[in-house]
Regions:
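Conserved N-terminal ligand/cofactor-binding loop architecture of enzyme catalytic domains
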Residues: 2-73
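Active-site and donor-binding regions of nucleotide-sugar-utilizing enzymes
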Residues: 43-138, 143
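A nucleotide-sugar donor-handling region in carbohydrate enzymes
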Residues: 121-178, 206-207
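Donor-nucleotide binding loops and adjacent catalytic segments primarily
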Residues: 166-237
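Short alpha-helical segment that forms part of, or immediately flanks, the ligand-binding pocket
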Residues: 231, 249-255, 274
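Acidic donor-binding loop of glycosyltransferase active sites
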Residues: 235-245
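A short alpha->beta transition loop at the rim of the catalytic pocket in nucleotide-sugar-dependent
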Residues: 237-238, 256-258
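C-terminal "capping" alpha-helix adjacent to the active site of nucleotide-linked donor transferases
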Residues: 277-298
Length: 298
């Protein structure tokens, strides 16, 4: 969208906009559940997928804050890339009769009812399989565009797909997703450190605790926090090890770099990993740490 000269784009973090005083606590609680109680998260995720009643955020306070945003921005179109955002805007449209088109950009390769809303005007589906699922849920074929998962322009540039020149040193890029979480990172880095001719780059995202723990630990391991220039590091990698987030998978697909997904444990990430393995652009290590250590040695 930013490449369109006539378009003015305003990006909003809806959680922060709607709940400015508690958004950090909500995010922290979610992160704690994912890191320590992911079994509960997966149970809730699966159960919500079986519910016939559509769950939407409602309430006078929510509508009041959304009205303030709409009145201030006067958008010609609303694009949502997160299920909570989809449900909130759909609920507001239903309540107020807002006519502004709602575009739902699905950023998981697996389908869940959290993405569907009758007030959505256009769906951007990552795959044909997702389009068929949306049609089963009642969406019209003409309202669904199969676009893949959109990635930033830096991943579409021609030089992003240039192969790295081979030398004696192999470079491994490790990423833990938006939360900066990676299973068994200690064992993984120790193994890579012990392998001759291997350098590693770890991107911890906004996980400051992980950054402080690993920065300057090994001279052959570069540790970075949040960076906007992910494509540069993917372009320079011989192998990427990461979580199976939908956007990340499509970024790696555009970068044409070999991919390892280690022990996906969140339900939607497991579904994403299965898709990547079936399509042949990722090696998924489902089991014990010994399994991926053996794969690294090959």
């Amino acid at each position: 969208l930013r490449s369109l000269e006539q378009a003015e784009i305003e990006k909003k973090d809806l959680l922060e906009e709607l709940y400015p005083h508690i958004s950090k606590f909500i995010f922290g609680g979610f992160r704690m559940m994912v890191e320590h109680c992911y079994g509960i998260y997966n149970f809730i995720y699966k159960m919500s997928g079986r519910m016939k009643v559509e769950m939407r955020p409602r309430g006078k306070a929510l509508y009041k804050r959304l009205k303030k945003i709409m009145d201030g921005e006067q958008p010609d179109v609303i694009v949502c890339t997160h299920p909570m955002c989809v449900k909130a805007i759909a609920s507001y449209k239903e309540k107020t009769g807002l006519k502004t088109p709602l575009v739902t950009c699905i950023t998981d390769i697996s389908m869940h009812p959290e993405w569907t809303a009758s007030q959505t005007d256009i769906y951007l589906a990552p795959t044909q399989e997702i389009k068929r699922h949306l049609m089963k849920e009642g969406a019209r074929a003409e309202d669904i565009l199969v676009t893949g998962i959109p990635v930033r322009q830096q991943f579409l540039d021609a030089d992003c797909r240039q192969k790295r020149e081979r030398n004696r040193t192999r470079r491994v890029l490790i990423m833990g997703g938006g939360l900066g979480l990676m299973p068994d990172l200690k064992e993984l880095l120790e193994k890579l450190h012990s392998m001759q001719g291997v350098e590693s780059v770890v991107i911890t995202g906004k996980n400051h605790k992980m950054y402080e723990e690993w920065v300057n630990r090994y001279e052959d391991v570069e540790v970075l926090g949040y960076t906007e220039n992910i494509s540069r590091y993917m372009r320079g990698a011989d192998l990427v090890i990461t979580k199976a987030g939908g956007i990340t998978l499509f970024e790696i697909l555009h970068s044409q770099v070999p991919l390892f997904v280690i022990h996906p444990f969140l339900e939607q990430e497991m579904n994403n990993a299965r898709y990547a393995a079936e399509k042949g652009f990722a090696k998924v290590i489902w089991g014990r740490r010994e399994d991926y250590i053996q794969e690294l040695e090959k």
